Amino acid sequence: MLDLIIKGGQVVTSWGVGDWEIAVQGDKIVGVGAPGTFSEEAGRVIDASGKIVVPGGIEPHAHIAAPFVAQGQNLSTAPPEQVSRAALFGGTTTLLDFAVQNPGIDVNRAIAERTSVWQGNSYADYSHHLMLSGEIDSNIMGQVREAVEEGFASVKIFTTNVRPPTTPGPGRMVRMGHLHDLMELIQRHGAMLLVHSEDDDMVMNMYRKLGDEERTVWWNMPLVHNNESEDVSFRRVLNVAGWTGSPVYFVHVSARQGIQAIGESRAKGMPVYGETLHNYCCFNSDKDRKSVV
């Protein structure tokens, strides 16, 4: 006997939209068919007449219970209980945040620490991207391989240190040689590489230039993280991806040039993807100074 049948709704699938029924056994969809396909009894039947039935959404980029400093205060983003509950009300059933491996910390410890934040505290399904920082030695590479084999199938890196050169603490940037080796591992084991892609030389040069000119107000951020930097860095990463065969997922794409680089690579059949943020879709740099923080 099936556990659940959903009938009467307009069902959205990867192959189209139709008036179909959905059969569920345990926690998995086991069938989608025309009305009357699943005539056997079910533990529960949901009448979705007049409704659109869609798969649960996946939030692929979230920073949950993540520390940050604002106006001199040590704060953190909302915890899993709060975020996962809100996500379910919006139809999102899976959340992915980041297990951060800082220099000197091994990957297994990073995963364990992040999992402890979520375990028993989430209403939704969850997992973590591995976020690597700085030098990636052979030990870290081996730990990444093991983590991928255990199901943590995505890794994020930065091609820039992002923050001003005066920021204390270790940097985030992964150098191109390590990126190449990581891409080979990613391709070999069927994982996905997420890249925060900017040209570090350009970013740091603009930080120094604006500092010298006493123009470090927040609305000049687009001058630091600019279109030229995104264009140069995306194409450099994509060139290495072409040599290694690695898939690439660019996070928070913000420039037309980045979109063009992704489109050109996809036209060649490369497994390249990009995501953006809603604020990039609603505002451009001309409106930054007028926006509300």
Residue spans of the language-model regions?
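Histidine-rich, glycine-flanked metal-binding segment
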Residues: 1-56, 70-71
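Active-site mouth loops of central-metabolism enzymes
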Residues: 60-78, 127-140, 223-228
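Metal-associated gating/positioning segment near the N- to mid-region
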Residues: 48-121
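Short, ordered loop/turn segments at secondary-structure junctions
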Residues: 34-35, 69, 99-101, 131, ...
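Divalent metal-coordination and catalytic microenvironments
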Residues: 9, 22, 27, 50, ...
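Short catalytic-loop micro-motif centered on adjacent basic/acidic residues
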Residues: 96-97, 127-130, 247-252
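Histidine/acidic residue-rich metal-binding segments in metalloenzymes
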Residues: 139-293
